[in-house]
């Protein structure tokens, strides 16, 4: 989907009153406020999320990406590139190919050269960003941060949207109904995002076919999390049938997830990295 088109559809739906203004959420006369104003200007109330990517070159493809029904994630010497299937009439089309890299390791000019060498695109935009999480996801017990106001993590795994949905669902079911406190809710969403961060970091641990400074750095970003280790151990304890949730005829517990991922997701990724990718790299 195109974020801009989706936003326009919601805003024009007529299901609620829309007022365009630049206000401080604390001044909004409402019981509860969802603050989705995007990335903050001041990061003093935020903490860094460990990740090897901090920049991206967005490109307009010279081929029809919509022919492929799934997104591509392509390893490069400087990081990785996403290719999102997008219709040429979509507002997102000019930015649907992105060369993700680390600007502290690779100069922008070098990254752009490598991008154009590997992909048939016109460079549309250069962006740099921080990976971060809010220290306090809930302000004054009534202002709920969400979207890029809550956190930002590089696009590998496209984890952001699901996190936003999970957070709203949790708030509606537990906080607004008085089943949980705002303090505990803040701890839970921060833990959830930490798990998302770790799962994304795991993607880099086996490296790629490129022996470069970026991949050396990316592989060095290890983490320690007992919950992650337990999920990985569980995923290795079942075959491809038993790993399915009980509701689908398997043996694992329904709703047992680390961040957004079940034991099945762990098993698929673990086997892909340790068996398929490692074998292919040995042949290079």
Where are these regions (language model features)?
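Predominantly flavin-linked oxidoreductase catalytic cores and closely associated redox partners
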Residues: 3-120
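Long, low-complexity C-terminal extensions of enzymes
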Residues: 177-284
């Amino acid at each position: 989907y195109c974020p801009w088109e989706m936003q326009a559809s919601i805003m024009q739906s007529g299901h609620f009153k829309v007022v365009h203004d630049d206000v401080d959420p604390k001044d909004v006369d409402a019981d509860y406020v969802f603050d989705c104003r995007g990335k903050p200007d001041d990061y003093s109330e935020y903490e860094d999320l460990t990740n090897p990517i901090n920049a991206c070159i967005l490109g307009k493809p010279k081929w029809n990406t919509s022919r492929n029904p799934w997104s591509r994630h392509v390893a490069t010497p400087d990081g990785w590139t996403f290719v999102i299937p997008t219709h040429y009439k979509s507002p997102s089309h000019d930015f649907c190919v992105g060369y993700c890299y680390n600007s502290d390791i690779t100069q922008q000019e070098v990254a752009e050269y490598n991008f154009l060498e590997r992909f048939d695109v016109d460079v549309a935009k250069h962006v740099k960003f921080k990976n971060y999480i809010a220290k306090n996801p809930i302000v004054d017990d009534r202002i709920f941060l969400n979207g890029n106001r809550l956190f930002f993590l590089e696009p590998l795994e496209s984890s952001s949207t699901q996190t936003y949905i999970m957070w709203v669902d949790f708030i509606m079911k537990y906080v607004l109904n008085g089943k949980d406190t705002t303090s505990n809710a803040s701890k839970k969403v921060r833990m959830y995002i930490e798990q998302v961060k770790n799962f994304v970091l795991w993607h880099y641990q086996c490296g790629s076919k490129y022996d470069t400074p970026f991949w050396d750095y990316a592989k060095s970003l290890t983490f320690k999390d007992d919950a992650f280790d337990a999920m990985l151990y569980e995923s290795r304890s079942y075959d491809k049938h038993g790993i399915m949730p009980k509701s689908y005829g398997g043996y694992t517990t329904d709703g047992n997830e680390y961040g957004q991922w079940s034991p099945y997701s762990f098993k698929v990724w673990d086997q892909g990295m340790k068996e398929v990718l490692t074998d292919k790299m040995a042949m290079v």
